[in-house]
Amino acid sequence: VLYPFVLLDIPAGNGLPDPEGGDEQPPLPWRGRITCIPARGRAGSPNGTAAIRDDIDALCGTTIPADIHVADNSVSWSGGDDGYRRMILHHAALAQAAGGVDGFLIGSELRGLTPLTDDTGAYPFVKALCDLAADVKAILGSETVVTYAADWSEYWGYQSGGPGDVAFHLDAL
């Protein structure tokens, strides 16, 4: 199984805005903290608005499988951004160049992104992961298991409000 891993190289004293309202982002945060600014539930958050789609699109980027090239056991790229899609598709191409893999994770524990909703109630990051999974499958072939490794808190769905208000937001994935 190939598991591209997101590490956040954010030093102490970074001065970057903290989505949760602190003075700045904490150093070396866990990838589950990646979210919108301000975070869901905070005043001014883009969560629940059309603007969240633009934020998710900017994070994911526009790289498509045709932008990644495998030749002579090397991988190159001709796209125009370095978003999340580029990283994952590049790793899929590396796996292809190495002869394939049995399984491939398109992400893990991105619990600050998966429950974000747009103005229609859709989950744009989950949709982006679904699209990415299809593109990775196109690169690696139908025999490769392509999946997302949810954080334990994502397994039971997203409780978005009142009692009994649970959305199983990862079901599409």
Describe the function of each predicted region.
Residues 1-121, 145, 152:
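Substrate-binding cleft and catalytic face of glycoside hydrolase catalytic domains
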